[in-house]
Amino acid sequence: MQQNTVTLILVGVIIFLFISLFFYVIYSFVQKKKNRNFKQIKIQPKKNNKITPTSDQKLKADEFISIINKKREILNHQRADYLKIKETQESYQQLQEVISEYQKKLNLEKIKLIDQMEKEIKDNLNEKAVYYMINAMEQHAEDIISSKFSFTIKLENEGMKGKIIGKDGRNKRHFEQTTKTDLIIEPNMPAITISSPNPIRREKAKRTMEKLLETKNMDIAKISLFYKEVEEGFEQTCYEIGKDALENKLHIFDIDKKMYPIVGQLNFRTSYSQNVLLHCVEAAVLAANIAQKLNIDPIKAKKAAFFHDIGKAVDFEIDNDHVNSGVELAKKFNFEDYIINAIESHHNKVSPKTVYAALVKVVDKLSASRPGARFVSNDEYFKRIEELEKICKSFEGVSDAYVIKSGREIEVIIDPSLVSDDECKILIKDIKFKLEDSDLVNKQPIQITLIRKFTQSITTLGSASRLRT
């Protein structure tokens, strides 16, 4: 009985413990669920408070992001370009240094090449050129004839002066009015002078005076009569002179005979005191001889050279220069185009279109540049000297220039601080080419000398400054 009681108590205790454990488990489960619900309740407001963007906002955000990305790309490109530019600038500076160094070497090579080419050209052509020119000029050597604007006629005695002057100067005055020249009679001079810039008038007056002096009697009627006779025969004289020049000297026969008197008038015209007809004949012969050496038509060369100054036969009678007058005459007499081009191009009014026109320019200068062939006035000489010095001084590094020996030599003073020895070799070539391009050295060669020297001076102390203590 007592044992059963104990057993029941134990069973009851076990049941109590089991029930307590059951309730504890249930309580724990409930508490966990409450805690979970509490967390969900606590977290839920955060989820509900989140801002949900609209479609417009998303679109704007995407556009903004796109703009930022584009800006980033632009910045990246600019940065890349900057780096490239920086590298390019550095490379350019290096390139400039290389170019500068190469330019110096190139200048030296240029000097060597120029010297070599000049030597080859001189070796190959100088001998032939000298031969051709000497040969051409040997075949036609004209006497040097220098004319002026006046004729001087010697008188047999002083008594002739009174007859020439006439009563109250009537004879002299009538002679001047008839011939349109100046009659100069100076005391204590056994001669009279006829002066006029018009060569035809001067020649007619000279012939009239010679006829009057032969009669030894002079009056107004005889002056008019003799002048009329001279004037009537003068055209025939010019015709004969022109015929002699064309047919006998140059063997040109296919020219209109009406051109002969005009050609003859060239005999009375001068250019820088050189007889124009003789100049034209000489140029024609030179052109023909050179043309033969060049294997071109010597007849065409001869014609083009002879007629290049034909305008000087009439230009003193009209208000025109001799080139335009020559072209008008050539067209009037139906000259061929190559002759017309030679006339209008020999003073560079137009460019030469044929080899004959170019040849005319050469022989024109050859004839005009013969020693003594032409007289140059002091004003023209000094003007030429000034122009030569001006051209030399136009180059950088040239401090001064002096023309010496009547224009045959030029001394060019170089600043040594601006021009090196090597650069002098290039400078002297540049000066040479520029002078040759001008019209100042076409008549004779000019020797150019560069003078580059370093000068430094110092003054010594006087004896008073050297007293010893």
Swiss-Prot record:
Give GO terms: molecular function aspect only: RNA binding; RNA endonuclease activity
A GO cellular-component term linked to this record: plasma membrane
Q: What EC number(s) would the UniProt record show?
A: 3.1.-.-
The residues that cross the membrane are 6-26
Q: Which CDD domains match?
A: HDc, KH-I_RNaseY
Signal sequence region: none
Biological process terms in GO annotation: mRNA catabolic process
Q: Which Pfam families match?
A: HD, KH_1
Taking every annotated instance into account, which residue ranges of this chain make up the domain HD?
276-369
* Positions of the KH domain: 149-209
User: InterPro entries under this entry?
Assistant: HD/PDEase_dom, HD_domain, HDIG_dom, KH_dom, KH_dom_type_1, KH_dom_type_1_sf, Ribonuclease_Y
Q: Tell me the membrane topology, using the record's own terms.
A: Single-pass membrane protein
**Alphabetically ordered keywords of this record:** Cell membrane, Endonuclease, Hydrolase, Membrane, Nuclease, RNA-binding, Transmembrane, Transmembrane helix
Question: Where found in the cell?
Answer: Cell membrane
Matching NCBIfam families: HDIG (TIGR00277), PRK12705.1-4 (NF009347)
Q: What does this protein do?
A: Endoribonuclease that initiates mRNA decay.
- Which family, according to UniProt? Belongs to the RNase Y family.
What is the name of this protein?
Ribonuclease Y
List the source organism: Malacoplasma penetrans (strain HF-2)
Query: Could you read off the lineage of the organism from its UniProt record?
Result: Bacteria, Bacillati, Mycoplasmatota, Mycoplasmoidales, Mycoplasmoidaceae
